[in-house]
A protein has these predicted regions:
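Active-site beta-loop-alpha junctions enriched in small/polar residues
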Residues: 23-25, 69, 93-97, 133-135, ...
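Conserved C-terminal portion of the radical SAM core fold
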Residues: 111-177, 209-230
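Local cysteine-cluster metal-coordination motifs and their immediate loop/turn environment
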Residues: 297-324
Length: 345
């Protein structure tokens, strides 16, 4: 139960792990709102498909996973999470599609690298995960050229992260992605838009190149783990893992001093009185039991509650599945208030 801003007592879900967010960039655009809601103790999440609202309580929250292309606006607020004993880490997408204009509202590559480094120095490189995601080709952007861009960004990030996560763009599966790639770029037509997805030969070239880059960096003293996000292909022969973006194993390792949270990650119970639960021999849960059933089959994420909303991210990335069109995003942005209980009033 939570008491709303209007004094009503309502039912609320009480997640232990919050995802902020797969659906929009909360750190970049809605940091003030997020911390206002944290202070209030709850937020409202609206299901865009059935328009139903869910109240989300922060009472039991022990960890937040942030997804962003620009963490700079949220950095001045992070001390509030530390003071509340709420753990956090970041998934930071740092691509270089400047020449193609695929990400029109993100800062320059150089500025994003500088912010990435500052955040890594502030909270530790194991809590700042680099994503080059998704991987897209065009008639003028080949896998070899993509690899060179990844090398350039990686050389700037060397030693500031432990992991690189990547995926291949999904175009055929998303009508709105196809429409936006045609409408908002000069790279594709309706007839050619699906060529943004790599062929098997192109994927092989890219994967082999990434593995070679990793080995090159390892020789230079940078041990970087490679992992795919939401990809069914088994790349174990290349030493490439299936990623868990909401990652219980990472959290157990990085936040090991929080015994109650580690206990939750192993058993699914966040004990108010741990000794009482131990009397019943709480069993460890497998990764399969922990899987977030609301995500794609190939997704390895554990259970969490996402509090974002589609059609609210103003980066306007042309490949994004979370935005239908820019006009809708602008209309939604006009309805946002940092003082409301939901992202959109």
């Amino acid at each position: 139960m939570v008491i709303t801003d209007h004094g009503e007592c309502v039912e609320a879900v009480e997640p232990v792990i919050i995802s902020a967010s797969r659906s929009t960039d909360i750190p970049a655009w809605y940091s003030e709102w997020f911390f206002n809601r944290l202070r209030k103790g709850y937020c409202v999440w609206k299901n865009v498909f059935n328009r139903k609202s869910t109240y989300v309580s922060f009472r039991r929250c022990r960890a937040v996973v942030f997804w962003t292309k620009n963490p700079e606006p949220i950095m001045p607020y992070l001390h509030e999470l530390d003071e509340r004993g709420i753990h956090y880490y970041f998934q930071i997408t740092l691509n270089d599609y400047v020449a193609e204009g695929f990400e029109p509202n993100v800062p320059s590559v150089e500025h994003r690298v500088e912010v990435f480094k500052r955040l890594s120095e502030k909270i530790g490189r194991e809590r700042v995960i680099w994503r080059f995601d998704p991987l897209i080709v065009t008639p003028d952007l080949t896998p070899r050229m993509l690899l060179e861009r990844i090398r350039n960004v990686g050389n700037m990030l060397k030693g500031y992260t432990d992991k690189l996560v990547f995926s291949f763009v999904d175009v055929a599966a998303y009508k709105k992605v196809r429409e936006n790639l045609v409408k908002e770029t000069s790279c594709f037509t309706k007839e050619t838009v699906c060529s943004a997805e790599m062929t098997e030969a192109q994927r092989k070239e890219l994967v082999e190149g990434l593995a070679a880059l990793r080995d090159e960096w390892k020789m230079q003293g940078w041990r970087l783990t490679l992992a795919t996000c939401g990809e069914e292909a088994d790349l174990e022969n290349y030493g490439i893992e299936h990623n868990r973006c909401i990652d219980g194993e990472l959290m157990k390792r990085v936040f090991a001093d929080d015994e109650d949270f580690v206990y939750y990650l192993e058993t699914g119970e966040l004990p108010e009185h741990k000794g009482q639960l131990d009397l019943f021999g709480a069993k460890h849960r497998s990764a399969k039991q922990w899987k977030d059933k609301g995500q794609r089959k190939a997704c390895g994420c554990m259970q969490s509650k996402d509090i974002g909303m589609y059609d609210t991210c103003r980066h306007f990335c042309v490949y994004c599945y979370a935005n239908k069109d820019r006009d809708l995003v602008r209309r939604n942005a006009a309805k946002h208030s940092p003082n409301s209980d939901g992202l959109i009033e």
